[in-house]
Amino acid sequence: MTQHSRDTPQFYLTAPSPCPYLPGRHERKVFTHLVGNKAGELNDLLTHGGFRRSQSIAYRPACDQCRACVSVRVIANEFKPSRNQRKLLARNADIVGEQRNPVPTSEQYSVFRAYLDQRHRHGGMADMTVLDYAMMVEDSHVQTRMIEYRKRTPDTGITGRGGELIAAALTDVLGDGLSMVYSFYEPNEQHRSLGTFMILDHIARARRLGLPYVYLGYWIEGSKKMDYKGRYLPQQRLAPSGWLRIDASGEMQPEPQD
């Protein structure tokens, strides 16, 4: 019998299940476990190949006769916010982002719970308990950070700490970028467009860190839930031939970037 090294990834295929993004279709996923000393290296490699991380699992779509899910990554150092995005950044100038270790808190869960109850009450995560949330945050064998977004207070300039928590993003730090694993926000702050704000903030963070990309996950044309990811240009989209560049004008370059 062949003996496999613990560091050799084994891949598995899920059974078909209803697609949560495109009605009438079914999805399948290929997945592997991110464990061992080389979990970080494997996560980097798989992310470059279109995988996403959920806890200690890396997965990507492997659907029969459907290739609608397209991995996208924003080119951070070339990105320029649009006029509307600049207005949004100005509107949220009273928010400070604080990078922390991936430690779950009751304050985070309160915002997370409110977000699910109002935005995704019928989704696959709707029944997550506080223990489920803790697992989502803590169960990582790769370099992960929790970025908390808080309202500024009169003392923020002195302490660096904000006040009320209104949003958070669980983010992996890769060798070539930041990967937004999951983000959530206070639904009563809808006028702030906090989902967009967090993406813009991650692009700025990646640029400051000298990292070329921000990985947003899957862009799905025609899906109300996922189509927004195509707005952050220039970006690259993963095709069978490699990562293809989409210019700020929306035009696709035919040759793979790397």
From Swiss-Prot:
It is an enzyme of class 2 (transferase). It catalyses: N-terminal L-glutamyl-[protein] + L-leucyl-tRNA(Leu) = N-terminal L-leucyl-L-glutamyl-[protein] + tRNA(Leu) + H(+); N-terminal L-aspartyl-[protein] + L-leucyl-tRNA(Leu) = N-terminal L-leucyl-L-aspartyl-[protein] + tRNA(Leu) + H(+). InterPro entries: Acyl_CoA_acyltransferase, Asp_Glu_LeuTrfase, N-end_Aminoacyl_Trfase, N-end_Aminoacyl_Trfase_C, N-end_Aminoacyl_Trfase_N. HAMAP family: Bpt. It is found in: Cytoplasm. GO terms for cellular component: cytoplasm. Belongs to the R-transferase family. Bpt subfamily. Keywords: Acyltransferase, Cytoplasm, Transferase. GO terms for biological process: ubiquitin-dependent protein catabolic process via the N-end rule pathway. Functions in the N-end rule pathway of protein degradation where it conjugates Leu from its aminoacyl-tRNA to the N-termini of proteins containing an N-terminal aspartate or glutamate. This is Aspartate/glutamate leucyltransferase. One of its GO terms (molecular function) is arginyl-tRNA--protein transferase activity. Its EC number is 2.3.2.29. Pfam families: ATE_C (PF04377), ATE_N (PF04376). It comes from the Bacteria. Its main location: cytoplasm. Disulfide bonds: none annotated. SUPFAM superfamilies: Acyl-CoA N-acyltransferases (Nat).
